């Protein structure tokens, strides 16, 4: 499809977040053009597990966004759930030690205070949830709201639905610069031509910082590498998304070095997905078998039957990490006409639809469903000023 000369909004990025922005903007009646340097869902959305989680989030802005996104996945978008294999499987967080269970109990109380459905599980009852779980665990917590989608299908079908409302999608179309009028962004220059638009949304994931830099603004999104292992197809031996309680700490950590914690979940196809790892190594793509071995050993400690299961493959990708662990969502006052929707790290699939709806609201002058100030693009400027004071 030829590049349009004009659009109401250009969305940069055809992953899950960009697709959600396009869907809700088109639904609001805007003429939308989506551009991506590669294929649909070619970045983080193709290298993740498709998590829609509340369990791994501390009470605060990110959890509020997760709750809002849940209302959309389960409400307005529920009729399309079969398209992206929405599965409300629930999540089980397990503690190996009593001290860890005490911390999990306190976290669950804070989450419950803001409306999260969570059930504490004592050690004797863990196998009611997961019969094949290892013996000797100290306890856990079950989160019925945790869910999963097939992330590439979610991105592809959200874009297909957006197309049905008039949006256009242009892959292999790299943004090289912005059209400017003074400080304002008024369009994009791409490898395939120029699109004039009064609004541009930076939904470029791990490349969000590079896109922001083209506009002369700083959005410190960094790539954080992670691996996933995939087993041979099996009967249903893992019922829920199951992970060790230390995973929550790793998600919230700013440590740049390698961190691993066991995450195990089944899929509709019978394979089991095994994670997780986190490390900041730039865009270094090589596979480290030692990381995979560490992940496998920790997964076996949760589910001993995995010791005899064949791992068919592994894949890795880069999560768009922000230093304060909050995404960047909303208009950028430093470059009027530029919006951001990036920096969701490992939560982008789950948070995508809430992000898209919030972006569409601000694009159309409608009051957003929640306060966007914690996600403001310019917040990092004040943090730097405080650091240098």
Model-based region annotation:
Residues 8-33:
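N-terminal Rossmann-like FAD-binding beta1-loop-alpha1 element of flavoenzymes
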Residues 10-12, 195-207, 356:
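Short hydrophobic core segments
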Residues 23-27, 52, 82-87, 184, ...:
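Active-site substrate-recognition segment that forms the wall
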Residues 26-46:
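Glycine-rich FAD pyrophosphate-binding loop
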Residues 49-129, 298-300:
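Dinucleotide-binding Rossmann-like beta1-alpha1 core, especially the glycine-rich loop
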Residues 64, 94-103, 142-160, 286-291, ...:
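Short beta-strand to alpha-helix junction loop
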Residues 141-198:
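Helical element adjacent to the flavin cofactor pocket in flavoenzyme catalytic cores
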Residues 151, 284-389:
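C-terminal catalytic lobe of FAD-dependent flavoproteins
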